[in-house]
C-alpha cells in the first residue's frame, strides 16, 4: 500500500510540473530569439571558416589530460587489491609520460599564444 501511495504522489507531482511548464512560458518570439546561437560567429556566413591551430593544440592537450584523469579515477579501488606496488608503478609511469609530454610541448612553445 505504501508503494502505491508513493507511486501515486510521484506521478501526480510529475504531471503537475509538466502542466505548469506548459502554462508558464512566455511566447515572445522575435527574430533575434528565433535564430540559433552560433558562438559569436555570424550564422549567415560560410561554415568553413579557418581557425587558429593554437585552439586545436590546446583542445588536444585538454583531451590528453582528461584521459589521464579518466585512467586514474579507478586508482583508489585498484590500491585495495593485493598488488599495490604494481598499481602504483603503473600510475607513476602514466603520470610521468604525460608530464614529459607536457614539458616537451611547453619547451616547443606549443602552449604560448604569441610568437
UniProtKB/Swiss-Prot annotation:
The entry's keywords: Electron transport, Membrane, Mitochondrion, Mitochondrion inner membrane, NAD, Respiratory chain, Translocase, Transmembrane, Transmembrane helix, Transport, Ubiquinone
Catalytic class of the enzyme: translocase
Keyword Transport: yes
Keyword Transport appears in the UniProt entry: yes
GO CC entries: mitochondrial inner membrane; NADH dehydrogenase complex
Residue spans crossing the bilayer: 4-24, 55-75, 87-107
GO MF terms, alphabetically ordered: NADH dehydrogenase (ubiquinone) activity
Annotated InterPro entries: NADH_UbQ/plastoQ_OxRdtase_su3, NDAH_ubi_oxred_su3_sf
Family: Belongs to the complex I subunit 3 family.
Function: Core subunit of the mitochondrial membrane respiratory chain NADH dehydrogenase (Complex I) which catalyzes electron transfer from NADH through the respiratory chain, using ubiquinone as an electron acceptor. Essential for the catalytic activity of complex I.
PANTHER family: NADH-UBIQUINONE OXIDOREDUCTASE CHAIN 3 (PTHR11058:SF9)
Quaternary context: Core subunit of respiratory chain NADH dehydrogenase (Complex I) which is composed of 45 different subunits. Interacts with TMEM186. Interacts with TMEM242.
Protein name: NADH-ubiquinone oxidoreductase chain 3
